[in-house]
Amino acid sequence: MPGRAGVARFCLLALALQLHWPLAACEPGWTTRGSQEGSPPLQHELIIPQWRTSESPGRGKHPLRAELRVMAEGRELILDLEKNEHLFAPAYTETCYTASGNPQTSTLKSEDHCFYHGTVRDVDESSVTLSTCRGIRGLIIVRSNLSYIIEPVPNSDSQHRIYRSEHLTLPPGNCGFEHSGPTSKDWALQFTHQTKKQPRRMKREDLHSMKYVELYLVADYAEFQKNRHDQDATKRKLMEIANYVDKFYRSLNIRIALVGLEVWTHGDKCEVSENPYSTLWSFLSWRRKLLAQKSHDNAQLITGRSFQGTTIGLAPLMAMCSVYQSGGVSMDHSENAIGVASTVAHEIGHNFGMSHDSAHCCSASAADGGCIMAAATGHPFPKVFSWCNRKELDRYLQTGGGMCLSNMPDTRTLYGGRRCGNGYLEDGEECDCGEEEECKNPCCNASNCTLKEGAECAHGSCCHQCKLVAPGTQCREQVRQCDLPEFCTGKSPHCPTNYYQMDGTPCEGGQAYCYNGMCLTYQEQCQQLWGPGARPALDLCFERVNAAGDTYGNCGKGLNGQYRKCSPRDAKCGKIQCQSTQARPLESNAVSIDTTITLNGRRIHCRGTHVYRGPEEEEGEGDMLDPGLVMTGTKCGHNHICFEGQCRNTSFFETEGCGKKCNGHGVCNNNKNCHCFPGWSPPFCNTPGDGGSVDSGPLPPKSVGPVIAGVFSALFVLAVLVLLCHCYRQSHKLGKPSALPFKLRHQFSCPFRVSQSGGTGHANPTFKLQTPQGKRKVTNTPESLRKPSHPPPRPPPDYLRVESPPAPLPAHLNRAAGSSPEAGARIERKESARRPPPSRPMPPAPNCLLSQDFSRPRPPQKALPANPVPGQRTGPRSGGTSLLQPPTSGPQPPRPPAVPVPKLPEYRSQRVGAIISSKI
């Protein structure tokens, strides 16, 4: 019967499948995996990767470079791998706890590690991130829309499964930070394009342009339990997370170095609960105590607990390097380390000042996971930063944030073993410029990593042309006013660690305080939100708006996740209130919250900012540190600063106590050491010296060259002033003509004179005679010697009059006299007549005259009386030129014949002209 035949065929088919199943599990091929209800079955392929190295990883030694061949969808992929030698800092430690709660800290048991970065051979813009500790785990990005996950099969020594990354399921979740997520496309193209620009190995020369984060990872007790109480498995997962995060941030020119790892094997060391806010602040408080024992830049907690709501991570904004807030918490929501790594990278991004991506920022589609800084994450995981993140990071660094990121770990004891030619300076090496075929350093022998003959150094910003630069040479400039410059010591080729002024140090002329290397003001924050021209609103706006305790006016969220009302004392630490003429804030998904307050009949406008979130986020979820809040570290009053939504006294920074030991001649840096002003010597700035600190290196010694130059300049100016004073006093002596012979008077005349006519200072100015017309005799002089002169106190004596053609009056004098332009025209004359010898003895002091021709009188400083000399009178000459006339009555003295004035040497004329020209 047809029915029985159908049943028989079904049974035979089922039997065949049962017989075939073991073979399918042992041979390469596609199989199905369980999937969520309503989704198609997910497939993975069973493979056995093939190593092409002298020794296979996992047998005691992991090679520095390796070639791995895997099959994926019928295609062989050749992976070129290189060990991530910068993943672990030299000071890396591991800490666990005994049952009694005592910490047990150890260093690495082996110099070998098993974490790699690489590419797919012959595939442009590809990227590989793997670990080979126990089997092969990691991510293989082939092209823009094709990437694979590879992981070992449980209880198998060689088999692995490989599947497309979109088949990795992650629970949906979001960050507590208030923002909305974008959608776009081609995430892998952007990600691999960014990673391609980075060198395959990070060379010593590149360290100076890199930012370096010393990361401390902590797994709480719930995470330890989630890994079946296996301490080694928990540590391996955290190491994998760090390896992925390092790969993500390399595209931003940032390296992540794991400086410490801690597993809470016997209970939590801080309060960890389902509340992400209380967990965050409890962990940050615990971290402050850790800093005294273990130096690091940033700490992240990985918890096995599930946070309430949809929050999977939380972190403060713009807090990188902060003693109080540089850290975050992330929930372990995936069995695969890459899912958790995306969340950790997201929270570190908030510490870097990155907000959630707005629309059109991310070029990765939601179907491919979107971008790392999206507000919500889920299926699949994000892997790339957006271009908006780059801009926000640059802006954060330019404002002085991330000061600790230049403090790169000493690479002389890198975790991973020593090898000449790996590009890292290690113990026993004088230099390392990479392989011989790629070394371009003229100071280093690539074959044996030694310095060439005569070379003192080969690497570092304090090494120039193979020589150490002089002590005091600046090697790192001061970025902003809260930063401090660093100087070479003359003993090391490397620039000292980057230091900045201690938190709580006044800046902006006392209008703000330094915090985390930044000088934060309300004005600057308003301009960041609204653009140029924005300014903070009146204090009344802060008090009225933030007293509401709602979405639009609050002092952040409390430990229960609810908005807090601001007390009048804390009002200026809540939502920032600004005044701006702009229609809306600069943030693409932000809206303006406008409030109008009436005070004594005056309308006051207050403008706040609210970042719009999607409907799924608006319901109860959000971060207390949204962009519309006043930033931590902003001055809210005298000796008060905003901290955690409260206006607190700055005494907890201990700045005043530290500053006292600097004796008023320096400031404290973030290492609590004095940075002395020039002229004072560290460590306490109480003795003369060049300045600087024990941390930042010495300031350059004062050079004697500028001092000598200054002394000579002062002496020259003094000599000029004395000469001018002498000439001035001589020119104001009344009725004392010189008794020197005529030739000597030529030699001792003043080489130049400053005009008192208020002219333009030109070398040959037109003089403004301050004497009424008809009161002065004006004679002409050779053109090369016509210079300004001081007016004498009285008319010239008779012996200075000569019979010669009259000189024209200056144009402005002719205009004042009402004469015609022709009357003031210049009359060229080649030579003037010699003056008659004096009829009486001359005074002993020489008269200081500008010109060596004494036929022209000196104009007086003030107007002469109507009849300056009794018995004389004046009358106009033809052509409008006024000449002083002798008395009309009485006998006239005989006049000697006119004798030509000898022509002066040419060099004298040039010298006079040069001196006066220098006064223009």
From Swiss-Prot:
Motif (Cysteine switch): 131-138
Leader sequence residues: 1-26
Domain EGF-like per the UniProt entry, residue ranges: 654-686
EC number of the protein: 3.4.24.-
CDD domains: ZnMc_adamalysin_II_like
Topology relative to the membrane: Single-pass type I membrane protein
Cofactor: Zn(2+)
UniProt-annotated location(s): Membrane
Tissue: Widely expressed, with the highest expression in bone, heart and lung, followed by brain and spleen and relatively low expression in liver, skeletal muscle, kidney and testis. In bone, primarily expressed in cell of the osteoblast lineage and not detected in mature osteoclasts.
Start-end of Polar residues biased regions: 767-783
Record motif SH3-binding, residues: 835-846
Domain of life the protein comes from: Eukaryota
Basic and acidic residues bias (residue ranges): 825-834
Keywords: Cleavage on pair of basic residues, Disulfide bond, EGF-like domain, Glycoprotein, Hydrolase, Membrane, Metal-binding, Metalloprotease, Protease, SH3-binding, Signal, Transmembrane, Transmembrane helix, Zinc, Zymogen
Residues at the catalytic site: E347
Biased composition (Pro residues): 835-846, 888-903
Disulfide bonds listed in the record: C321-C404, C361-C388, C362-C371, C475-C495, C658-C668, C662-C674, C676-C685
Gene Ontology molecular function: metal ion binding; metalloendopeptidase activity; SH3 domain binding
Propiece residue ranges: 27-204
Functional note: Participates in the proteolytic processing of beta-type neuregulin isoforms which are involved in neurogenesis and synaptogenesis, suggesting a regulatory role in glial cell. Also cleaves alpha-2 macroglobulin. May be involved in osteoblast differentiation and/or osteoblast activity in bone.
Domain notes: The conserved cysteine present in the cysteine-switch motif binds the catalytic zinc ion, thus inhibiting the enzyme. The dissociation of the cysteine from the zinc ion upon the activation-peptide release activates the enzyme.
Entry protein name: Disintegrin and metalloproteinase domain-containing protein 19
Species of provenance: Mus musculus
